[in-house]
């Protein structure tokens, strides 16, 4: 590592150009339950951002050079929308990084981890269905870092639930205050538009799916034009607005940035209605890249500022088999400070060695594009031949380790069974390496049995395919009778020994050697926790963390 001097945080002001570029960044994710309209909203944000002209036609940034690849065919076979998982576009003098959180059968631990790389989130709620299970899980992940959340209540052009009921449900179920910014006028066939509470104007709804269009604006809720246009709806609108102004929380930027309050917008993504207001809110209210906590020693941490000159960041996702001919793996890397430039040398902190960053990628919908330069908030794709794991930190010399990239307790468990028993060593090696990479969680039980944990069925399918392709191991995954896993922290060695003696096969070890309790049911977990009050049972743990 002699070539790279250790970087220390500078006491001098931040480089002005770097600071300006960082302030222009907005990096956010979209969270929703499947079918709430996330994919549609993503496309419409790109449409309003000028990144696409019509559905399916994509423009990359002018400065980008194209890298050709046949990975799209792999995606079609797999049914995974990987290429659109990170999208960058320019809008109103800002650089927007939009990170997708895959849903449906694509749901995996990656869905959670993506949220560790954003500075804000847009939560999409189906106005007919309200808060749904996957939204609850994703919001819990946002809460780990108090991520600011903007809410978009979608599909107002359909028959939906009462707006006050939806706000109440969001507040009660998600435990976050709502501050309505726009308010709907009617719904379904009588959806007329929204009233903007902060700007005292009505945006009139006109259906139209294809091109971006400006909504017609009527100034003032007392405007007589409203009585002419919406004679049946205007009375109810004025009553509801009086109610909101008297009873609901006014918007507080401080509470929003602290993750305590969500501004709420109503609209119809498929009709481009309400999308521009979301984009504007991201520019006006969502934070630019934020300082990040990084460990500098086992006991000590420091706050890394995004406009510090030395480059640093962390890997939050690894996507394998993008190109089967090359065993192509891409490590998705969030830049946290400094500036990326092609060909730069960096320190791989976990391995303690130098590596060169060349041909890093950025993403624009269906295209991978070679990255020329990037700053905090940007996401780059690094070609990875197994040297990078989820949670790894790269720096320009400083021994940093970014915090806040968690493992989550799996919700599905399987045991691997070999078709060829002579391949057990290859299976063990494959599972160990895939576990270290973060593709799946691997637990070793008493007697050496390997148990796999995932948050989505797709993870098992991808691992089975990779075992076959990369390790020549044909394995069948059979469902295991495990309800959940909890990482254990013991107060002392005596308690540890007594617990392990009593629980026996229920105690396993994860890929880093940390003790884990494998509960067979919720009742089993609750009884065990009650019996051992001094033992910590944790649903998450940090990547690379060694528990006592």
Swiss-Prot record:
What InterPro entries does its record include? EF-G-like_DII, EFG_III/V, G_TR_CS, P-loop_NTPase, PrfC, RF3_C, RF3_dom_3_sf, RF3_GTP-bd
- Top-rank taxon, per record: Bacteria
Q: What residues bind GTP, as annotated?
A: 32-39, 100-104, 154-157
The Gene Ontology biological process annotation of the record reads: regulation of translational termination
One GO term describing the cellular component:
cytosol
Cellular location of this protein? Answer: Cytoplasm
Could you tell me which PROSITE patterns the record lists for this protein? G_TR_1, G_TR_2
List the molecular function annotations (GO) for this entry: GTP binding; GTPase activity; translation release factor activity, codon nonspecific; translation release factor activity, codon specific
Q: Name one Pfam family in it.
A: EF-G_D2
Function as written in the Swiss-Prot or TrEMBL entry: Increases the formation of ribosomal termination complexes and stimulates activities of RF-1 and RF-2. It binds guanine nucleotides and has strong preference for UGA stop codons. It may interact directly with the ribosome. The stimulation of RF-1 and RF-2 is significantly reduced by GTP and GDP, but not by GMP.
Q: Which family does it belong to?
A: Belongs to the TRAFAC class translation factor GTPase superfamily. Classic translation factor GTPase family. PrfC subfamily.
The protein here is known as Peptide chain release factor 3
UniProt organism field:
Aromatoleum aromaticum (strain DSM 19018 / LMG 30748 / EbN1) (Azoarcus sp. (strain EbN1))
For this protein's source organism, the top of the classification is: Bacteria, Pseudomonadati, Pseudomonadota, Betaproteobacteria, Rhodocyclales
Gene (UniProt): prfC
């Amino acid at each position: 590592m002699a070539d790279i001097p250790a970087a220390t945080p500078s006491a001098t002001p931040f480089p002005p150009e770097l600071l300006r570029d960082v302030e222009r960044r907005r990096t956010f994710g979209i969270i929703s339950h499947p079918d709430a309209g996330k994919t549609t909203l993503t496309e419409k944000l790109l449409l309003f951002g000028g990144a696409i002209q019509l559905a399916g036609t994509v423009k990359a940034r002018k400065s980008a050079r194209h890298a050709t690849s046949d990975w799209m065919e792999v995606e079609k076979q797999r049914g995974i929308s990987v290429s659109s998982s990170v999208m960058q576009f320019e809008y109103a003098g800002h650089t927007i990084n939009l990170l997708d959180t895959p849903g449906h059968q694509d749901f995996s631990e990656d869905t959670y981890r993506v949220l560790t790389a954003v500075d804000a989130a847009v939560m999409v709620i189906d106005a007919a269905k309200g808060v749904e299970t996957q939204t609850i899980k994703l919001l819990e992940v946002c809460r780990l870092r108090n991520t600011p959340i903007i809410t978009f209540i979608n599909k107002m052009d359909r028959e939906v639930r009462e707006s006050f009921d939806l706000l109440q449900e969001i507040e009660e179920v998600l435990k976050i205050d709502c501050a309505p910014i726009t308010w709907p006028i009617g719904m379904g066939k009588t959806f007329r538009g929204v009233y903007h509470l902060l700007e005292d104007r009505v945006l009139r709804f006109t259906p139209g799916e294809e091109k971006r269009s400006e909504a017609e604006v009527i100034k003032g809720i007392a405007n007589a034009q409203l009585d002419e246009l919406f004679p049946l709806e205007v009375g109810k609108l004025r009553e509801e607005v009086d109610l909101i102004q008297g009873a609901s929380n006014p918007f507080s930027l401080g509470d929003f940035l602290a993750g305590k309050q969500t501004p709420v917008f109503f609209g119809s993504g498929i009709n481009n209605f309400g999308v521009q207001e979301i984009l504007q809110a991201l520019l006006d209210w969502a934070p630019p890249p934020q300082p990040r906590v990084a460990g500098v020693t086992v006991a000590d941490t420091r706050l890394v500022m995004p406009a510090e000159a030395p480059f640093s960041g962390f890997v939050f996702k690894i996507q394998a088999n993008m190109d089967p001919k090359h065993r192509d793996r891409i490590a998705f890397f969030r830049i946290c400070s400094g500036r990326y430039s092609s060909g730069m040398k960096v320190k791989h902190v976990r391995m303690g060695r130098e590596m060169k960053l060349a041909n890093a990628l950025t993403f624009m919908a269906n295209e991978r594009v070679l990255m020329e330069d990037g700053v905090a908030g940007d996401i780059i794709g690094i070609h990875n031949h197994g040297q990078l794991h989820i949670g790894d930190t790269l720096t320009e010399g400083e021994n940093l380790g970014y915090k806040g990239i968690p493992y989550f307790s799996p919700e599905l468990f399987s045991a691997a069974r070999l078709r060829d028993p002579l391949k057990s060593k290859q299976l063990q090696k494959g599972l160990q390496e895939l576990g270290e990479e973060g593709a799946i969680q691997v637990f070793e039980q008493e007697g050496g049995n390997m148990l796999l944990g995932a948050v989505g069925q797709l993870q098992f399918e991808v691992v089975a395919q990779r075992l076959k392709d990369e390790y020549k191991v044909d394995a069948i995954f059979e469902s295991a009778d495990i309800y959940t896993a909890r990482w254990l922290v013991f107060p002392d060695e005596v308690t540890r020994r007594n617990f392990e003696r009593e629980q026996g096969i229920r105690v396993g070890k994860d890929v880093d050697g940390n003790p884990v309790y494998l509960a067979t049911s919720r009742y089993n977990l609750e009884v065990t926790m009650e019996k051992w009050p001094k033992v910590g049972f944790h649903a998450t743990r940090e990547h690379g963390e060694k528990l006592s």
